[in-house]
Every structure is written in C-alpha cells, then in structure tokens.
C-alpha cells in the first residue's frame, strides 16, 4: 500500500457579529471558523539539504486565499494548530501541506517526503463544511537486498545507486543480511554492482538503468547468484509493501 498521510480538516462556518467599528465592514459581520487537527502533514519549505533531526511527520501547513496570499501558516502542526480553531472570512482557500524544512531533493536513509493539498470554501450562511488533505510520498523509495546465496561466495560485493538529478549523492550498500532502505528525488536511477570473488578477481561491473521513475515508486534491488554463478541484479517495482499512515482532524478552539 502506498505511503499515504491523510489529514482531515473540519471547517465550521458561522455568523460573527462585528462590534468594533474599526473592523472591516466589507465582511458584513460574517466570519468562518477553520478547525484543524493533523498528525503528519506540512507545506512546502524548499530546502534541498536535509535538516538535522529531520522529522517527515512534522508538518508545515499553509492556508492561502483566492488571491494566493498566505493567511495562516505553521511549521509544526501538532505543536501549534492541532485541535485548534481559527477564524477566516468567507471565501475560497487552498490548504497545502508537506514535510517541514525539506523539499525531497536529496538522497539518504530515513528521509521520506510527503506533500498534498486541497481547496475549501468557507460559506457565509453559517453551515458546516469539511475538507481533507491526503499527503502522499513525493520521493522514491529504494531497498537494497542481498540474497543469502551471495553472502559467502564473494570477497566483496556492493550495489550503488546514482540519480539523474543534478547534485544528488549516490547511495551504496555492501553485502549484508540486513536490508538498507534509502530515498531519492524523482528521476531516473542507475544501479551498479562491484564484485570481487574469493580469489581476489574482480568481475566486470554490472549496470541496470531504471527509467520512468515516479513519485511513490518503490524499487527493491535484489542481488543474487545468476545461472552462471556470477552476481546479478534484479529490479522489482513494488509499492504494495509501503504502509500508509492515516491522520485525522479533530475539533478544537483557538
């Protein structure tokens, strides 16, 4: 199942009587209330370097009006907005969310990047409306896997994955029973093996291109003995083993 972060946004629109003359009379005494309670979402902060202590579930959320102006924003939804209620004038809004402090343009372990958005209308008649954001994995997952058949056959064995995206570091995994999971930005990938047998003889490097790479793809790189006894790579595209994370919005008061 693909990585999915679901956000529920409950919007209560109600009448608000303006008692102060200084307030904008163009609203004609009507305001709306937006109630949020997210568990893992955030809006785009474009930083290609992975921040220290990056937490993909710390969410940056932005609310923009119909003119594209940011009217509300937070870099930490759980800490600042979860369970809170905010007042908004009637109108159309876009709510965007993404993992805070990172735009997915780097490779490495433990750096999934999530993003999503939705639109909502705050009505003037006081009726209640609801909206939801589904934040999906926006980068690419790669799993290195070494078959047991190769563990005791070669002196050294490694797989390296490089990205076609400029400035993105390659990722390497040496022969081990432990899988290694890394993430890349969306872009074509190249897998290369480096193999030396027990006699110290290196084998010619094997390369496999992976093209047509899309967000949420999961590639499992299996390194195992081929029919000739040499090391080989098989590439399995499988996004079904990626768990989903569901987040819900609850009511609160700002």
Feature locations, PLM:
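Sec-dependent bacterial lipoprotein signal peptides
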Residues: 1-18
């Amino acid at each position: 199942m693909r990585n999915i972060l679901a956000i529920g946004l409950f919007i209560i629109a109600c009448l608000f009587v303006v008692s102060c003359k200084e307030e904008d009379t163009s609203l004609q005494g009507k305001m709306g209330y937006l109630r949020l309670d997210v568990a893992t979402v955030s809006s785009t902060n474009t930083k290609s370097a992975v921040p220290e202590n990056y937490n993909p579930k710390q969410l940056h959320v932005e609310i923009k009006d119909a003119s594209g102006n940011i009217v509300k924003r937070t870099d930490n939804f759980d800490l600042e907005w979860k369970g809170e209620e905010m007042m908004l004038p009637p109108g159309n809004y876009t709510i965007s969310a993404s993992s805070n402090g990172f735009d997915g343009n780097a490779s490495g372990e433990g750096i999934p990047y999530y993003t999503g958005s939705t639109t909502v209308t705050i009505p003037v008649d006081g009726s209640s409306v609801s909206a939801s954001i589904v934040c999906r994995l926006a980068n690419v997952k790669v799993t290195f896997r070494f078959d047991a058949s190769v563990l005791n056959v070669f002196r050294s064995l490694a797989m390296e994955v490089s990205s076609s995206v400029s400035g993105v570091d390659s990722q390497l995994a040496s022969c081990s029973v432990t899988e290694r999971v890394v993430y890349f930005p969306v872009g074509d990938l190249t897998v290369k093996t480096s193999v030396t047998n027990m006699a110290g003889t290196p084998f010619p490097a094997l390369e496999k291109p992976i093209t047509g790479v899309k967000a949420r793809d999961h590639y499992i790189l299996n390194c195992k003995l081929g029919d000739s006894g040499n090391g080989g790579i098989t590439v399995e595209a499988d996004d079904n083993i990626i768990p989903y994370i569901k987040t819900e919005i609850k009511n609160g008061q700002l």
